[in-house]
């Protein structure tokens, strides 16, 4: 990205970061409310189908809100923030083989339990699980490594642009903790920051 494409003031940079974060939350919230309302009237044959539709809705709505603010609010392009539909072959390979590897490890150290799901239900559950991961991964990467990182880099420097989004990434995951302990929160912040870097 050419840094001369935009040069926001400190306050404008912080406001833009806040707006993108709120759009990130709004995409998920509005999608959840819409699908919960819709499916309170329409019954689906499977909970996994609900998850599939909700994750697709959240992904598309969040991406649309990001695009709308970027192009109409800031009069910039998505590629100005490093966001392009360019998919690398090695990325696809890693995204397929890493879950297979992790599943194999769990299968070796865990115990098998027989479930009563049909083949169709198992397929829906697998697709739902993949969409949960894709939705989270894509929208979080757009927010933290796209918008926030590029805004901070444009205003300050690459070190701040790497550290702050990584730290914010870890803070966003605190509410997903099952139990709150000081050591648990500190471990999440440290590991989330390291993963983000």
Per-region residue spans from a language model:
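Membrane-interface helix caps and helix-loop-helix hairpins in membrane proteins
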Residues: 111-119, 173-182
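Membrane-helix interface segments
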Residues: 48, 87-89, 122, 155-160, ...
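Small-polar-interrupted transmembrane alpha-helices in polytopic inner-membrane proteins
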Residues: 158-174, 189-192
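Helix-boundary and loop/linker segments of multi-pass membrane transporters
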Residues: 5-13, 44, 81-85, 116-124, ...
């Amino acid at each position: 990205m050419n840094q001369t494409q935009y040069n926001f003031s400190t306050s404008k940079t912080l406001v833009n970061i806040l707006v993108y974060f709120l759009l990130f939350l709004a995409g998920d919230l509005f999608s959840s409310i819409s699908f919960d309302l819709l499916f309170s009237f329409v019954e689906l044959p499977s909970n996994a189908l609900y998850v599939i539709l909700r994750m697709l809705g959240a992904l598309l709505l969040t991406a649309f809100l990001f695009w709308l603010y970027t192009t109409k609010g800031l009069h910039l392009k998505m590629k100005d923030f490093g966001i392009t539909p360019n998919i690398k072959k090695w990325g696809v390979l890693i995204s397929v083989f890493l879950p297979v590897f992790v599943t194999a490890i769990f299968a070796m150290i865990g115990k098998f339990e027989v479930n009563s799901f049909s083949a169709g239900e198992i397929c829906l559950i697998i697709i739902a699980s993949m969409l949960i991961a894709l939705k989270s991964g894509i929208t979080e990467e757009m927010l933290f490594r796209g918008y926030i990182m590029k805004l901070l880099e444009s205003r300050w420097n690459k070190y701040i642009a790497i550290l702050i989004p990584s730290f914010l990434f870890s803070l966003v995951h605190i509410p997903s903790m099952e139990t709150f302990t000081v050591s648990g929160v500190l471990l999440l912040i440290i590991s989330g920051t390291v993963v983000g870097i």
